[in-house]
Amino acid sequence: MEQITARELAYADIKVGDKAELSKQVTDADIMAFANLTGDFNPVHVNEEYAKKTPFGGRIAHGMLTAGLISAVLGMKLPGANAIYMKQELAFLGPVKIGDTVTATVEVLEKIDEKSRIILRTSVTNQAGKLILDGKATLMKK
């Protein structure tokens, strides 16, 4: 994934309906790095022989690896710098396999001006456009 600079948006400049996204191809190296970082070595993620016997038919990425891409969009693009993650609801709807290209998208649903809060829909789709993760985030924007 390319290095990007966090976008600097003022709270007042963020509007309901604004969207941002980030796409990434998920690799074996990503999955292994996530396993090493978190200590989650569940064999469905790291052992191909084991994973072949599961309903997935092979290794899949950790759900939270996929969800982590949402954090990247929120922190780097919308709402960007000076935003604090307060809450995240997630529903994992399908697997991410090695080689899949996933796109994390956020969309501003609501602003709560008196608390400088932003509520966003958070979703991830795969290269076929299938929704694989859906949720809602609440952030505080300075």
Region spans (language model):
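HotDog/MaoC-like acyl-thioester-processing domains
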Residues: 1-2, 6-16, 96-142
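Catalytic strand-loop segment that frames the active site of acyl-thioester-processing enzymes
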Residues: 2-61
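Generic structural detector for well-ordered beta-strands
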Residues: 21-25, 91, 107, 138-140
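Short, intrinsically disordered, mixed-charge
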Residues: 36-40, 75-79, 127
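Hydrophobic beta-strand-centered segment that forms part of the acyl-chain substrate-binding groove
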Residues: 52-61, 67-105
